[in-house]
Amino acid sequence: MAKSYDVVIIGAGPAGIFTALELADTGLSILILEKGLDIRERIALNRDRTAPAADRRANIVSGWGGAGAFSDGKLTLTTDYGGNLDDYMNKGELARLISYVDSVYCRFGGEGRQVYGDEHRDKIHELKRKAAAADLAFIPARIRHLGTDVNGEILTHMRDSFPSHVTVKANCPVDHILVKDGKVEGVIAGGETYLCKYLVAAPGRDGAEWFTKEAESLGLHTASNAVDIGVRVESPAEIYEPITDICYESKLVYFSKSFDDRVRTFCMNPYGFVVTENNNGLMTVNGHSYAHKKSGNTNFAILVSKQFTQPFHEPIEYGKYIASLANMLGGGPIVQRLGDVRDGRRSTAERIRRGLVHPTMPSATPGDLSLVLPYRFLKDIMEMFEALDKVAPGANSRHTLLYGVEVKFYSSRIELSNQLETKIPNFFAIGDGAGITRGLAQASAAGVVVGREICARIGKPKGEI
């Protein structure tokens, strides 16, 4: 027999969690369906080095907290990047929303974690000048760095805060969304039918492909997003201290001379660690930094954004194909010295060992990224290093390590109203999996928007943010 709830939320990432937080005091019956583990089981599995490797890898991208649960916990407190919510509201509204999201993270344990970017105005101006001289755009941001360990504690506190009328079902992937006569009915998950008045789809990056197919089957208009493909860079932390000491997170954007492609840095982790990420069986790379554990290196991604034109409309499949080549050649991520890339030769374990940069992910296979990345992408990345070296001397060192590949998959973007509602009444789509956000802060903010919209519809509006 079908079970009924007022609200069903698909996905327990930041978008889904913040929707539930906004609704928690309304008395509505709420069901959160999550394909991965609940937070305590998830943390335990992440620490269990004896657990099957496949289970540990899958645990990285799904479960309570979403793909960001084991990230380095960066809250990007800016409207300049991190998503496209400014397409649905003005920047002033978005800034207030992000500030509110930050206050919620602080309330659950983030208070006291350092905010970068409020000081060093003169030094930031000088960095912008140097970047411009190198054909780079330097985009600083205010960042609250929670750290991977503190981020896990915050997610646990959030999980524990929900009253009894909020039900969480972990290990329960949603199979289908139910719509009848143009109205949302509920979902089928784990062989059970769950009916609802309001449906919030927050499937996350790991559920992006599934959600795109569901949206298309329901006749919802979608548009393909770009795919970002590149490498994770690792260098001695001292090289990037002139940037990271004054601005923990920033973006450097470059348009390549050869192809006019947009190339950018992403997710800089001072004194951090390179890690593997499991995307439905495909092993890619990412980076973390911790509040209480440090390495001697800084890592970040260099990504090339590619927006495909008609007739091609499967950027996710293209990105998966590139990642599969690295897996085929290296059995997982490949690592190569920048100097070996320039010299047209593969890296060997011996050359990596003799290098000046000691890898924080020793499990990566020394290899040849030119056999994986298309020429266009590799050329763009090499040009980016030449430009970076003018801002951070040493960036273009032959000892710099490149791990590949790093791929950022973005769901096809669903056509939404300013309330983040699909054309099907009371069916909302939010977060990275809906193609409208790209980070913790804006994904969380999207959840607040929908939570408050549902509050308004049931006659319990919340105050202005």
Stretch-by-stretch model annotation:
Residues 55-57, 63-116:
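Dinucleotide-binding Rossmann-like beta1-alpha1 core, especially the glycine-rich loop
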Residues 88-95, 99, 117, 147-148, ...:
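Glycine-centered helix-coil hinge/cap
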Residues 95-102, 119-133:
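Structured alpha-helical segments in the cores of large, soluble enzyme domains
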